[in-house]
Amino acid sequence: MIALLLAQAAVAATPAWKLADRTNPAGVRSISASVTGNDGLSRFVVKCDVGTEPIVSIQFIQPQSLGQGADKPVAVRFDGGPAFTYSWQFPGTGTYIIDPEAITRLTTFLVKSKTLRVETTNGAGFAVQANFAAPASDAMVRQVLGVCGYTLGVVPPPPPPPPAPKDTQ
């Protein structure tokens, strides 16, 4: 009986992934799958924003500022394995990456894992890290990626170049 109660408590303590799908008054759709970290404060987000063009991002959000500044390395580890390190953008309290190859690799590993860990530094150079539960299935991540035209596990082709200006002479 005690083992059953402990098992139920462990399941209840695992943060659940949540899907949010919104459209703002300007018609920009934003859909995301996110989870709160084991610390109860950090968040890991897979997001698609569809405005003039679709943009997929992976975001790591902290309650304390990570510092605004130049891009810097962020490492993501799945199930305690080797780090996948990419250069992420740092606008302030969070950090994000929009590189399609990185998004593809990170989401592919994310949906096959049980846990993930994000490691970086804040604006003062101090280590910042957070642990998260991976999603129980790939459904939410597939849904988010699909809205932006991505297929899980497939790097999308680059967008076509803009049309050349017409000669007015």
Describe every region a protein language model picked out.
Residues 11-169:
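A generic "folded-domain core" signal
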Residues 2-13:
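Hydrophobic h-region of N-terminal signal peptides that target proteins for export
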